């Protein structure tokens, strides 16, 4: 069992023939991901990396039954790519693109809310189910199969947490990089919920950062639903000055509850095992799994 992507997922790359799309598609194919083709308008009918190129996502869905898309489209066109994927019937839309204008994301987010799809990102590292599918830009060798799920706003800390968990001999079920923009498709709570409902996931690592309410919402949901599985939490940005964007466009402290300190307090009150340093994540997971 896994969430979002697995060995049966039929994955396409939007922005397939561009430099980013090409590089990461090669890595995904090498990993063993079931990549069935890609989309570059105007290049339909060609082959790239031994896979078919389509002019539209609809063609890819009709011809190769694509159900997952990963987007490497420049920021100005990325919201359109998201909406096109949703229109065509893609079930999981993973958007790597950074710097999509907020106004565009408001439009795309509103457009897809009634569609039968799930958006991950934008500005995220993607999703990996070790040994089955790597749909993103993460280094595949860091991850191995196991029983710990990861939800993270930070790409780098996703890899760090995975490395520590694997070194504890526990491994990963699915790691979900949700992205650090102000408007994202799947929230921390929704990603945690997916892993809570996955029978193979025995523990969840939740990595957040300053800014917004996502981690507090997730923590309260975990408590309200009876703390069914242990959750280990870390919040990045404790030393960030108020009012300044730190790394991610969404990482800006607005109110008192946006600070790392406030988030850690809320998480602890909700029964989450909070660590003060990312270096402690692996040990804490091993401790709570027992």
For the regions a protein language model found, what residue spans apply to each?
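Catalytic-core regions of core metabolic enzymes
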Residues: 1-290
């Amino acid at each position: 069992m896994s969430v979002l992507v697995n060995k049966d997922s039929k994955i396409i790359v939007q922005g397939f023939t561009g430099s980013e799309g090409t590089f990461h598609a090669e890595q995904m194919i090498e990993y063993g991901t079931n990549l069935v083709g890609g989309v570059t308008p105007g290049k339909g009918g060609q082959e790239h990396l031994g896979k078919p190129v389509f002019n539209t996502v609809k063609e890819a869905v009709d011809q190769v039954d694509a159900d997952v898309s990963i987007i490497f489209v420049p920021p100005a066109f990325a919201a359109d790519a998201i909406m096109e994927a949703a229109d065509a019937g893609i079930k999981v839309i993973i958007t790597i693109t950074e710097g999509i204008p907020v106004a565009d994301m408001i439009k795309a987010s509103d457009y897809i809310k009634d569609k039968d799809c799930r958006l991950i990102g934008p500005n995220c590292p993607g999703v990996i189910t070790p040994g089955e599918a790597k749909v993103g830009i993460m280094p595949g060798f860091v991850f191995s199969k196991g029983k710990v799920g990861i939800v993270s706003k930070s790409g780098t800390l996703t890899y760090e947490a995975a490395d520590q968990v694997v070194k504890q001999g526990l491994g990963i079920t699915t790691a979900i990089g949700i992205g650090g923009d102000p408007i994202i498709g799947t929230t921390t709570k929704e990603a945690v919920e997916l892993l809570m409902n996955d029978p193979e996931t025995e523990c969840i690592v939740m990595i957040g950062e300053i800014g917004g309410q996502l981690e507090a919402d997730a923590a309260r949901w975990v408590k309200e639903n009876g703390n069914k599985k242990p959750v280990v939490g870390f919040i990045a940005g404790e030393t960030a000055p108020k009012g300044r964007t730190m790394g991610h466009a969404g990482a800006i402290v607005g109110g008192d509850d946006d600070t790392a300190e406030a988030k850690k307090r809320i998480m602890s009150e909700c029964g989450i095992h909070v660590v003060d340093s990312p270096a402690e994540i692996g040990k804490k997971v091993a401790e709570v799994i027992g």
